[in-house]
Amino acid sequence: MEIIISNWWVIILVIVSLIFVKNFSKKSKVDIKKLIKEGAVIVDVRTEAEYNSGHIEKSINVPLGDLTYRIGEFNKEDKIITVCAAGIRAESAKKYFNSKGYNATNGGKWSNIKDII
């Protein structure tokens, strides 16, 4: 009981985080589905080997390390969805795209997006 009392803020933080993640996931799936219907470009930032082991049909493989010199391949008017194995590299790619004036969204795990399509 003493541990719970002394760490009450950690418990509250975990609960709030779980609520946020649950709500974010629901919202993002709807948004991603809409973006795909609108013709968004899906950019898979996993390595070539990861991509070759399974990927979303019509997605473009640009490993995260190559993005800085391949970004010119994309049109700034296109909506972009970044994906990877867990969502972490996709977030980095999204931030990079957006910092260069593109309209990018982190799609998270490629396998989750594949299930929505």
Residues covered by each model-derived region:
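Short, surface-exposed ligand- or partner-binding patches at beta-edge/loop junctions that are enriched
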Residues: 83
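Short hydrophobic beta-strand that contains or immediately precedes a catalytic carboxylate
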Residues: 41-45
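Rhodanese-like catalytic fold shared by cysteine-dependent sulfurtransferases
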Residues: 2-31, 38, 48-79, 88-117
